[in-house]
UniProtKB/Swiss-Prot annotation:
It holds the Pfam family COX3. It comes from Dictyostelium citrinum (Slime mold). It is found in: Mitochondrion inner membrane. This is Cytochrome c oxidase subunit 3. It is an enzyme of class 7 (translocase).
Length: 431
């Protein structure tokens, strides 16, 4: 068992995961500083190292080997159905609902498999993360080329309208949307969502608890700073690292037999409960019981500080993710409302075709971006980001938030495309 943990901690690309077992305090999950995988403490839980999820196989190369999955078929077959349905080859409302559900489910399965390979199977090395980011960048560039061709068509006909449409743009007799109203609201929604999502990612990568300078946050930050200084001091004066020292202490206390381990678990839970009481009395001194003795074990205080910090930080980030999702859903609703009550249709000449093609293609990208943001939100809820050190925003290939970063890139791409759409179609095209 000891050799297993020595091998486990020697691999810097590994991150210890939460197994959902509350086993008390006094457990060192890893060095919070100078490691790639940070400090893996899950919200309201302490990590039990003996139950760490082990990878299914050892990866002896840095390259990306994917496992078999039905996700690509679940995504591409609905796209083929949408094309056939558009041209009238297949016409079925039930089939459309099934295809849309399959598309969303396929993207979800795909995302889950990527998360599994990254966190649970530990297959995402530096090269793999770089490949994922570069793949997202190439995908965004290809989508830019798509929109470039559509905008080219729009400018080709609008800058030199022919006699078939009355030599004017928009075509004579066609009622078009004003750049005020719903288009302006959609612009505000997308820009606001991009700013909120960026702020959430900044909080995650810069390890901020919250922006507001209230007394509780300041107290937590001061205590956290003192704890970090203590770690640094202990590491500098001891031959063993703080992690090794704490791990050895844990095994000395808890690796004797099952009965002693259960006793240690109960004691740890009791210490945490006592700490909760101590925090309560700190905020309500008038209720302090006489001769009350607060816990002084560093591991208990360590656990409490980490838990408070992660709870505050992740709560703020999840709130921003919720707001981003709300903005995206409202945008899609407004777009659908605009389509339903549009004074023209796709069959009303070149203007209607280009309008619905450009805005509809963008709306599809908003839907995909909403799914990606929803997946990141679910990952926050289940505790995938309950790490202190996820890396900075300038360490995309090394940090533990590569998926969040790629989602942020994609959402900014959606924002920028909409700004061009708003200026070209709604503002310039309606003048």
């Amino acid at each position: 068992m000891k050799r297993f943990f020595e091998n486990l901690f020697s691999q810097t690309e590994r991150s210890v995961l939460n197994t959902g077992k509350k086993v008390g305090a006094g457990i060192a999950a890893g060095e919070w500083k100078n490691t790639e995988w940070g400090y893996p403490i899950a919200t309201q839980e302490v990590i039990f190292l003996a139950k760490v999820f082990q990878p299914q196989h050892v990866k002896r190369h840095p390259y990306h080997i994917v496992r078999g999955t039905i996700a690509p078929l679940a995504v591409t077959l609905p796209l083929a159905f949408f094309v056939l349905n558009y041209f009238g080859v297949i016409s079925s409302k039930i089939g459309f609902v099934i295809a849309l559900s399959s598309f969303i489910g396929g993207l979800t399965i795909w995302a889950i498999s990527i998360v599994f390979d990254s966190l649970y199977d530990q297959q995402h090395t530096y090269e793999v993360k770089r490949g994922l980011v570069m793949g997202m960048m190439m995908f965004i560039i290809s989508e830019i080329m798509f929109f470039f061709s559509f905008f080219w068509s729009y400018f080709y006909i609008s800058l030199s309208p022919n006699i078939a449409i009355g030599c004017v743009w928009p075509p004579y007799g066609l009622t078009v949307y004003s750049y005020m109203g719903l288009p302006l609201l959609n612009t505000v929604l997308l820009l606001l969502s991009g700013a909120i999502l960026t702020d959430g990612y900044t909080i995650l990568t810069e390890q901020k608890a919250v922006h507001e300078n209230n007394e509780k946050v300041i107290a937590v930050e001061e205590a956290f700073t003192n704890l970090m200084n203590l770690y640094t001091k202990k590491q500098s004066i001891n031959t063993l690292t703080f992690v090794d020292e704490r791990r050895e202490k844990f095994f000395a206390k808890n690796d004797q037999n099952a009965e002693k381990k259960e006793i240690a678990i109960s004691a740890g839970v009791k210490e945490l409960r006592d700490l909760d009481w101590d925090l309560y009395f700190f905020e309500n001194p008038q209720n302090m019981e006489p001769n009350y003795k607060a816990p002084t074990d560093l591991s208990v205080i360590e656990y409490a500080l980490i838990t408070i910090f992660l709870k505050k930080r992740n709560k703020v980030i999840k709130t921003r993710l919720y707001f981003t999702l709300v903005c995206a859903v409202v945008f899609l609703f407004c777009q659908g409302y605009e389509y339903y009550f549009a004074p023209f249709s796709m069959n009303d000449g070149i203007y209607g075709s280009l309008f619905f093609l450009l805005t509809g293609f963008h709306g599809f990208h908003v839907l995909v971006g909403s799914i990606l943001i929803g997946i990141i939100t679910i990952r926050f809820i289940v505790g995938n980001f309950d790490l202190l050190n996820v890396g900075t925003k300038f360490q995309i290939f090394k940090n533990k938030s590569t998926g969040f970063a790629c989602t942020l890139f994609y959402w900014h791409f959606v924002d920028i495309v909409w700004i061009f759409l708003y200026i070209v179609i709604y503002w310039w095209g309606s003048r």
